[in-house]
Swiss-Prot record:
GO terms for molecular function: O-phospho-L-serine:2-oxoglutarate aminotransferase activity; pyridoxal phosphate binding. L-glutamate binds at R42. The gene is serC. This is Phosphoserine aminotransferase. Its cofactor is pyridoxal 5'-phosphate.
Length: 361
């Protein structure tokens, strides 16, 4: 059987060790004779899963004690609404950094609940898209919070700086880059992340929220999106996505076994440098993002001759290199190389790219 590498942007590749363990435990979890999918979320067995997964996540990210960790439904899109409805309080404006497709999607949703101060931080120089340094962002004085997306999956644009905005409440959509490297949680008021890219399977959303921000929700906010309600009920106000929670917990343990986020940072940098090096080597492939803002997680690229795209994708698929088609908005190709992607997968891709260029360049 051909070795398959899944470059999907999400739902994305999971560590093979996690999949093997889940397969082994699927029908007889912890000797219970049932699957983890079948047991009560309030059973002592699943409560252990919940407690261990939170502890492991706190260890990985070094989450301070004054932050709550919530395991939620709804994906990042639900948080586009939950953030303003939980954090606005008596204010009517928030700063929204517009750096790409997903940041703009959050802005569009927030417009239903407040007047976003939209700050476009993109730059375009010599055909390359980049992001202004944070010190140039024109933040307002009366905003309830500052929202931004550190990694844009579609355009492959990353904001690698950590925020330093004094006492402003910073909210970040870390859906596609959480757990890829260490970050300083104390610089943020809220971090949220859909699980299906760099955590686990689709269906779970993580929210990390500073305790002093709880209890400010709009009266019309549905309880299922109320951070205080979720925190007071240990993320079990209603039945949580138990299987996704369990698998994410296995991923957290796998990350710790691999050496933690410092080790992930080294691996992810090495994978990204290998792939960008292959793209930059000649003019056959190209990436249209400024070097300082290139994403380690999502690498879009195009060919000088776009008529070769379909052939590239079909031949790549035949070689076990799956899900390389670019997003419908951007076209071209895109390789998503999250934590679970081994460097062998990136090497297989770059070898194929070099061979394809030799034959069609």
């Amino acid at each position: 059987m051909t070795q398959v590498y899944n470059f999907s942007a999400g739902p994305a590749m999971l560590p093979v060790e996690v999949l093997r363990r889940a397969e082994q435990e699927l029908r007889n979890w912890h000797g219970l004779g049932t699957s983890v999918m079948e047991i009560s979320h309030r059973s002592k067995e699943f409560m252990q899963v919940a407690e261990e997964s939170e502890k492991d996540l706190r260890d990985l990210l070094q989450i301070p004690a004054n932050y709550k960790v919530l395991f939620c439904h709804g994906g990042a899109r639900a948080q586009f609404a939950a953030v303003p409805l939980n954090l606005l309080g008596d204010r009517n404006s928030a700063d929204y950094i517009d750096g790409g497709y997903w940041a703009h999607s959050a802005i569009k949703e927030a417009q239903k609940y407040c007047t976003p101060n939209v700050i476009d931080v993109t730059t375009h120089d010599n055909g390359l898209t980049g992001i202004q340094p944070m010190k140039q962002w024109k933040l307002s004085d009366n905003a309830a919070y500052v929202h931004y997306c550190p990694n844009e999956t579609i355009d492959g644009v990353a904001i690698n700086e950590q925020p330093d905005f004094g006492n402003k409440v910073v909210v970040a959509d870390y859906s596609s880059s959480i757990l890829s490297r260490p970050i300083d949680i104390s610089r943020y008021g809220v971090i949220y992340a859909g699980a299906q890219k760099n955590i686990g399977p689709a269906g779970l959303t993580l929210v990390i929220v500073r305790e002093d921000l709880l209890g400010k929700a709009h009266t019309a906010l549905p309880s299922i999106l109320d951070y205080k309600v979720l925190a007071d009920n240990d993320s079990m106000f209603n039945t949580p996505p138990t299987f996704a929670w369990y698998l994410s917990g296995l991923v957290f343990k796998w990350l710790k076994e691999q050496g933690g986020l410092g080790e992930m940072e080294k691996r992810n940098q090495a994978k990204a440098e290998l792939l960008y090096g292959a793209i930059d080597r000649t003019g056959f492939y190209r990436n249209q993002v400024a070097i300082t803002n290139r994403s380690w997680m999502n690498v879009p690229f195009q060919m000088a001759d776009a008529s070769l795209d379909k052939l590239f994708l079909s031949e790549a698929e035949a070689q076990g290199l799956q899900a390389l088609k670019g997003h419908r908005v951007a076209g071209g190709m895109r390789a998503s190389i999250y934590n679970a992607m081994p460097i062998e997968g990136v090497k297989a891709l770059t070898d194929f790219m070099a061979d394809f260029e030799r034959r069609h360049g």
